[in-house]
Amino acid sequence: MVKLASNENPYGPSPKAIEAFRSYSDLHIYPNPEYRELREKISDYTGWDADRVVVGAGIDGILETLFRILIDEGDEVVIPIPTFPYYHILTKLSCGKEVLVRRGENYRIDESIFDAITQKTKIILICNPNNPTGNAEDAKLIEELVNSTNALIFLDEAYVEFSDVSFSVDAENVVIARTFSKAFGLANLRIGYALLPEWLVSPFRAAMTPFPLSTPAAKAAEAALDDVEWMRSCVGRIKAERERLYKELKKLVEVNLSQANFLFFESPVENLAEELLKRGVIVRDCSSFVGCGNHIRVTVGRPEENDMFLEALKEVLGC
């Protein structure tokens, strides 16, 4: 069975991260709630101010804390669709009001998002590169958005290491969130981090779940940051395979260009995910994503895994 459904790094984490995780033995002691060493290493990696860096149980955990602080019943949350499904779940759980904005050409956010912003808009959620479509957003539009509203703009950069996204936004109404789950290969440990505006740091730390990361997880993340070359090597291999897989898929289906570690395409047949599963390949059926039709998302795996997917797809399509 080949799993190409969850956008994981098929090469796994740095061996140094695995060793750091395994070697920690003080499991009877609670973590240090400051996570200072990890935050400083994140600062070295990103260039961000360590005093404004927070960590959480994945990007999801960070977003949950922000919603706990900021969203009151009836507050509006602007969500370009299709995008990461948890945004919808969290908005509903927080009694916020979803304002859905359909993406434009090539699934990019366009000028229509400005019409969705009102005095009640509290948060604008932007996944960049976007899950499940894989596209990156226009830097100029993001900058205009930041300057046009007082609402908090949450930039989810879970897949940024796989992209050509290079612009940096540092403003009083911007949160940038990233993860160790994708490029760093630590998905099972659920380690997210974010850069907050200064005014939000104290409220966030007061509202966050106590000890959101275990010490072994934090130590693994620190070791991963000490071996960034491992991650970059994995990303290089994944990007090369992404290009190869894209070219092969183009011969079979209409597939979207991607700046992430997955590809997104409209299925020419019904129940494609089920048919691929019968042939030993697990992909993500995106029909449940708000704003998605009969689409499939496939993770870029190792070359042999991608070949198995392509062979199974050809068999289903009768090619």
Swiss-Prot record:
Gene transcribed to yield this protein: hisC1
Superkingdom is: Archaea
State the family named in the UniProt similarity comment for this chain: Belongs to the class-II pyridoxal-phosphate-dependent aminotransferase family. Histidinol-phosphate aminotransferase subfamily.
Task: Report the source organism.
Answer: Archaeoglobus fulgidus (strain ATCC 49558 / DSM 4304 / JCM 9628 / NBRC 100126 / VC-16)
Q: Which UniProt keywords apply?
A: Amino-acid biosynthesis, Aminotransferase, Histidine biosynthesis, Pyridoxal phosphate, Transferase
What is this protein's record name? Histidinol-phosphate aminotransferase 1
| Enzyme Commission number, as recorded | 2.6.1.9
* Signal peptide region: none
Q: Which classification does the entry list for the species?
A: Archaea, Methanobacteriati, Methanobacteriota, Archaeoglobi, Archaeoglobales
Q: In which pathway does it act?
A: Amino-acid biosynthesis; L-histidine biosynthesis; L-histidine from 5-phospho-alpha-D-ribose 1-diphosphate: step 7/9
Mark the residues carrying the PTM N6-(pyridoxal phosphate)lysine.
182
Mention one GO molecular function.
pyridoxal phosphate binding
Q: Which reaction is catalysed here?
A: L-histidinol phosphate + 2-oxoglutarate = 3-(imidazol-4-yl)-2-oxopropyl phosphate + L-glutamate
Cofactors that this protein relies on = pyridoxal 5'-phosphate
Q: Can the keyword Amino-acid biosynthesis be found in this entry's annotation?
A: yes
Q: Which InterPro entries match?
A: Aminotransferase_I/II_large (IPR004839), HisP_aminotrans (IPR005861), HistidinolP_aminotransfase (IPR050106), PyrdxlP-dep_Trfase (IPR015424), PyrdxlP-dep_Trfase_major (IPR015421), PyrdxlP-dep_Trfase_small (IPR015422)
- GO biological process terms on file: L-histidine biosynthetic process
